[in-house]
Each structure stands twice: as structure tokens, then as C-alpha cells.
């Protein structure tokens, strides 16, 4: 296969069937898997059409045949209280006969350049290969904790001021509840119609939801779930405070006579076992989302560092396998009130870091002290202490899937 015969260009809506066919081939999505969640092939295409219209999709073509592709969804996320435009990378795939031609590297490079032009200075993705995306500049920023609780281990009922009511899973009440939660949750995606469409896309028809309302009738949390074969499956549970969490678990425990166990996932950094009276439950942790900073100086300009009594500086060199704007020596200045500026400088620097490590550090997933200990940051002790004091301590919450 000769790369000279291939052309890279935007993928229009007329190629939607080819787009989906490529994804189904690469990720081995069968008709049986589609039907298990109530989908038919044509329904998937219709469901994806509105999303494709909003996305930035680029691909390589062999004549009129789409052979490699990436898509970027326009999204917004919260980073320590600051709202950022984010590029959600998805739809990544190449037919095997076109592999080893460097097609995907070029697509990722172009996608990142497009994000930069659109001021999307942070990019999220769900990785099919963590090593591959690490080589391209992404790094882990969140975890998923899966758990299994036997019926006799469910928490006992505790009195709360509010109440739980079942609602339509696709209703506005659920969206309002999530919006209240995401507004103050670090890392959370601020879901618009596109993000909600992706959130529900692969769910079953019989999925259910319930909302916890506080004593002022304000929605302070929800649970999304289904029940099958005497198992209570929790897709997601969010809550703004401990009272809402307790109220939602009261609701789960009320199903005691109907179920043998509860299986679910949580996307916080807090294992569930410690909160239960019978803590001997099954829990497993796995990496979930990755991210990469697209344009470091632009990202830092909006980043909310912690305020301090003094101005702080750090000179360092940074590597990035794709984006030139993130390569070279930098001077990072942090003002007393926590405003950051980063400019390129010409002199060489003793301290060094990669864009991968910078991303996971500034997103709060791993701390500077830990990253220095494992050799991911090369800097003196005073610099590491300064970074520890300057960066908020809270891993991102991401429960989306796209």
C-alpha cells in the first residue's frame, strides 16, 4: 500500500455509513451485541447523524473509501472550578491493511491542531490502548472502581431530611441534577445534548433512574440502574453531599427482598468499602480516562493555581511527541492570587517534564511529590514543594463514555 495514493480530508455526513462500518470492524461490534442493547444497524446510523454534524471528523481516503479516521466532539469540562472548552477524541480506527503507514499519527496531529485553533486546550479520550496514547502525549487522569455488594452487606436505613423519587431516565429532571453536580465537580463534563446522547447510546431500553430531593425539593443526587436476574446494577450514582448519598443508598437497600447482590461502578477516588459497616466487599480499580494538554501556555493562562503570599517561578524543559507549542524550555510564573503565565525561553533548563506528566499533575490525578519520586519530574525539592502547594488536591470525576 502506497501512502501517496491516500488523501487526508474532512469526513462529511455522506460518509456516515463508512464511518460506522470502520468502527464496527476495528472494535469488533457484532449484530448480536447491537441487538442486546436494542439497536439495529440503521438505528445506530440515525443516532450518530446529529453527533457527526457537530463533530470535527477527519480521515484518510483511498479513492472514495474511508480507511482511517478520528472524530473530535466539542465539549466543556470543569477544571478546579474553571470551565474549559475540551476536545473529546473518539471514533479512532484504521483498517489493518492500511496500518504501519503513519496515518493515525498524522490524523492525531491534525486533530490537535484543529483543537488548538478552536481554543480547546484540553483533550479527553477513552483509550483502547493506554501505551499507544501515552506515546502520543496522553496520560491517565481518572479511575473507575467496580464493586459487588451482597444483599446482607447493604447499608442499613438511615433517616434523611429529603426523599428519593423514580423519574424518567431521559427526562429533564435528571439533566438538571447532573448539571448541579457537575458545576462544582473537578473534571466533570458539562453535558450538552451531544454529551448526553453519547452517555446513553449503548444503554439498555429498561434502564431506570431515581433522584434524591433535599428538604427544599432541590435535586441533590441521582442513581441510574437496572435490575436483572436478582442483581441490582448501578450504572452511575452522583451526590452533592453525604445526606444525598445516604438517601440514595437507602433506596438501593429498599430492594433487599428483590435482589441477591448489587454490582456497580463509581468514578471518585474514594473506595466504597470504608463507608460500609460490612466492608468485606469486592472492589477492583482500573484506569478510565486519559487526557492531554493541547496548548500548554494557553491552558495555564486560565488554570486556577492556589493563591499564596509570594510569586512563584519554575524554569523547565518539556517534551511533547506531537505539538511544537509544548516543546522546549519554559518559564512558568504563578502570581500571588494564583494566576499562571507560561512563556518559552531560549536558555536550557536543568528541570524537565513531559506533556504527559504535566497533564496528569495539573489535572490532579497524581501529585508532584509522587511524580518526582518515580522519575517523571526532574526538579529540586524546593520546586516540588512549590508545585505541591500550588496545585489543588482532587482527582477528576469522569463518568461519561464516548
Which role fits each region the language model picked out?
Residues 1-17, 28-30, 161-402:
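Intrinsically disordered, low-complexity, positively biased terminal segments
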Residues 23, 31-77, 186-209, 299-305:
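Active-site rim helix/loop that mediates acceptor-substrate recognition in acyltransferases
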Residues 57-59, 65-75, 88, 93, ...:
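Conserved beta-strand in the GNAT
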Residues 76-83, 149, 229-236:
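A short, polar/charged loop-to-alpha-helix boundary motif
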Residues 89-113, 242-253:
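Conserved acetyl-CoA-binding loop-helix of GNAT-fold acetyltransferases
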Residues 108, 113-127, 257-267:
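Conserved GNAT acetyl-CoA-binding A-motif
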Residues 117-121, 127-145, 247, 269-285:
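Conserved active-site alpha-helix within GNAT-family acetyltransferase domains
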Residues 147-165:
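Contiguous, non-catalytic segments that form substrate-binding/exosite surfaces or channel walls
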Amino acid at each position: 500500500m502506497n501512502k501517496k495514493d491516500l488523501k487526508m480530508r474532512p469526513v462529511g455526513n455522506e460518509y456516515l455509513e463508512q464511518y460506522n462500518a470502520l468502527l464496527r470492524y476495528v472494535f469488533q461490534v457484532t449484530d448480536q451485541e447491537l441487538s442486546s442493547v436494542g439497536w439495529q444497524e440503521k438505528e445506530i446510523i440515525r443516532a450518530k447523524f446529529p453527533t457527526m454534524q457537530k463533530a470535527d471528523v477527519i480521515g484518510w481516503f483511498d479513492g472514495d473509501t474511508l480507511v482511517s479516521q478520528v472524530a473530535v466532539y466539542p465539549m466543556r469540562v470543569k477544571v478546579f472550578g474553571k470551565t474549559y472548552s475540551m476536545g473529546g477524541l473518539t471514533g479512532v480506527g484504521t483498517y489493518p491493511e492500511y496500518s504501519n503507514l503513519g496515518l493515525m499519527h498524522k490524523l492525531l496531529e491534525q486533530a490537535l491542531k484543529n483543537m488548538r485553533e478552536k481554543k480547546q486546550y484540553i483533550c479527553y479520550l477513552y483509550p483502547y490502548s493506554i501505551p499507544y496514547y501515552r506515546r502520543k502525549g496522553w496520560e491517565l487522569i481518572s479511575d473507575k472502581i467496580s464493586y459487588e455488594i451482597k444483599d446482607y452487606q447493604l447499608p442499613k436505613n438511615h433517616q434523611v431530611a429529603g426523599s428519593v423519587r423514580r423519574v424518567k431516565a431521559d427526562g429533564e429532571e435528571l439533566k438538571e441534577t447532573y448539571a448541579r453536580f457537575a458545576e462544582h465537580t473537578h473534571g466533570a463534563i458539562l453535558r450538552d445534548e451531544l454529551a448526553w446522547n453519547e452517555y446513553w447510546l449503548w444503554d439498555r431500553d429498561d434502564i431506570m433512574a431515581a433522584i434524591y430531593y433535599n428538604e427544599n425539593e432541590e435535586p441533590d443526587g441521582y442513581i441510574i440502574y437496572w435490575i436483572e436476574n436478582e442483581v441490582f446494577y448501578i450504572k452511575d450514582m452522583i451526590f452533592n453531599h453525604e445526606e444525598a448519598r445516604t438517601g440514595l443508598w437507602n433506596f438501593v437497600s429498599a430492594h433487599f427482598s428483590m435482589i441477591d447482590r448489587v454490582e456497580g461502578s463509581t468514578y471518585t477516588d474514594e473506595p466504597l468499602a470504608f463507608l460500609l459497616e460490612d466492608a468485606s466487599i469486592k472492589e477492583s480499580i482500573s484506569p478510565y480516562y486519559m487526557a492531554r494538554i493541547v496548548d500548554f501556555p494557553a491552558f495555564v493562562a486560565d488554570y486556577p493555581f492556589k493563591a499564596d503570599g509570594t510569586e512563584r517561578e519554575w524554569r523547565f524543559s518539556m517534551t511533547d511527541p506531537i505539538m511544537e507549542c509544548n516543546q522546549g524550555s519554559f518559564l512558568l510564573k504563578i502570581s500571588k492570587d494564583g494566576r499562571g503565565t507560561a512563556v518559552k525561553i531560549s536558555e536550557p533548563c536543568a528541570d524537565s517534564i513531559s506533556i504527559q506528566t504535566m497533564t496528569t499533575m495539573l489535572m490532579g490525578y497524581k501529585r508532584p511529590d509522587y511524580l518526582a519520586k518515580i522519575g517523571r519530574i526532574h526538579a529540586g525539592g524546593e520546586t516540588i514543594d512549590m508545585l505541591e502547594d500550588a496545585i489543588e488536591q482532587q482527582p477528576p470525576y469522569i463518568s461519561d463514555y464516548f
